[in-house]
Amino acid sequence: MPSIAKLPDIVANKISAGEVVQRPASVVKELLENSIDSGASAITVVIKEAGRQLVRIIDNGCGMDSDDALLSVERFATSKISDVDDLNALRTLGFRGEALASISSVSHFELKTRRQSEPVGIQLISNGGEIEGPQPAQCEPGTSISVRNLFFNVPARRKFLKSNATEFKHIHETVKAFVLAYPEIEWRLINDDHELFYFRTPDVRERLSHFYGEGFGESLIEVTEENDYMTIGGYLGKPGMMVRQKYDQYFYINRRLIQNRMLVQAVQQAYAELLEERQSPFALLFLGLDPSLVDVNVHPAKLEVKFEDEKSIRSMVYPVVKRAVRTADFSPEATVAPSPAPVGSHGIGLPESSSRKLAYSDFSGKSSTTGDLYRNYRQGAFDLSGASVPPPSIDPVESSFGSGSGEPYPSMVQESLLTPSADQPSAADEQNPVAPDKEPKIWQLHNKYIICQIKTGLMIIDQHVAHERVLYERAIDVMNEAVPNSQQLLFPQKIDLKPWQYEVYEEISEELYRLGFTIRPFGGLSVMIEGVPPDVRDGNEATILQDMIAEYQENASKLKLEKRDNLAKSYSCRNAIMTGQKLDVEQMRMLIDRLFATRMPYVCPHGRPVIIRLSLGELDRMFGRT
């Protein structure tokens, strides 16, 4: 008896499903491709419990008769190609004929379909690959496919699904990619019985503004280029619209969404110096190419493609994008500086009462890492040789970064670095006053690093991660306090969140409250920010919240972090002073004092170094003085 046997179809389909169906979003993608290929002009997506309970796709496409419906759930059965040469002329999104077979083998699957010319439709059911039907059924023209209890018979795969917020985020991103690529189709998305959008008009800019905020679509740079080899069209973001994640870059070949590193790099390099560190431009680009010049059959999910001549593609995309962003008007609109905030309001304004203090825990006595290096810094930077320098302590202070300098704030300086009020010197200053005519030996390098003379040489501090460490420890301590500390806004801010953002917000709302955010639902996907932690810069409340949610979600998908730890990391990263922000001597001095008052001043919350020391001995060796 031979030891090699052909696998039963039901087993083969489950194996195939491991490549084709990785998560609920994979089901959505495959079914939407079929709906588009059917010629549908209206598509509805219904989701329950992030696709675990239900994924339903309803379209008004051509529909199927009973024979085609039965064949559609068979492996390698398709109407889109008939021989190998057809792969070189693909105009459809699907072509392998394995999606429905794979999906139906790992779910409770129901298909209803009807041709326009037929008075009655048909229904077909599959429970884990066991087919029932087809049988007559009343239904609208087109096709409706319901996928329930995904992976019910593959518990290992179901176990490895992420949180509902993460899984729905992938679903929403998948649907959004199709919505932007097919404006001629009416799109409707319903999640847990709530309609998230219903697009009836073929206006891409309108759809972009829905997803990214009012006016977003109108402010984009439109790109149009064509030659005998390829067409390029789409939209690009201006520098003020840059994002820190690459979720918002969409590349299509013949309206098929793809992932391609070369295209990402070409766009990134075309923007060049217009980008700040870690920024990426928004891009929605459609490339039209002869199907014979691109192979889409190189990836199970059809996301990756192989170009016949990748260099030619890049040589067109790069100059087109570069020319578009170089010729666009990037000058910012003039804005009127806000008048000083009244006493007691959030942000920078008139001197506030010294009775308004932050409720952060006193760090004095907690730090065990400030010792010799802090003394070296104080003695070297302020010429306090021989003086007794105690570890820094942080008393309750006011959120008025630089308020004692007497100079206006630089436009990009983060006001959230806490400094003592004018009538409340720090403990270190009280015991070691610095003569007013003695300039501290502290400098800022390229608005990025702080350089200090210390008794034994030189100390270099990364200003962003230093402030990140300070904010992180404060956030952890505040969330562990009995009573949250929140600075109420004079004018509450309404924010419209994306569906996946709202899911994350609901997940972390309690921790946000303990951190100091006072937020209440405001109908639909909107929330109202009524209060924020005192560290948050005035006018930056909405941006900080949305950036925190994005950072939290990214951390959750990559790292296994406790919820409060994740939120504290997200808050500190997004709220810290950034590279490019100029600090004056007093601001740098206070940042250093706050850093050395933390429990772990040498590394940031993500493990990056904060401080580098260079001793006189090492410098002497470099110059051959030893």
Curated annotation (Swiss-Prot):
One of its GO terms (cellular component) is mismatch repair complex. SUPFAM superfamilies: ATPase domain of HSP90 chaperone/DNA topoisomerase II/histidine kinase, DNA mismatch repair protein MutL, Ribosomal protein S5 domain 2-like. One of its GO terms (biological process) is mismatch repair. It comes from the Bacteria. The keyword Cell wall biogenesis/degradation does not apply. The keyword DNA repair applies. Keywords: DNA damage, DNA repair. Residues 385-413, 418-437 are annotated as: Disordered. Belongs to the DNA mismatch repair MutL/HexB family. This protein is involved in the repair of mismatches in DNA. It is required for dam-dependent methyl-directed DNA mismatch repair. May act as a 'molecular matchmaker', a protein that promotes the formation of a stable complex between two or more DNA-binding proteins in an ATP-dependent manner without itself being part of a final effector complex. This is DNA mismatch repair protein MutL.
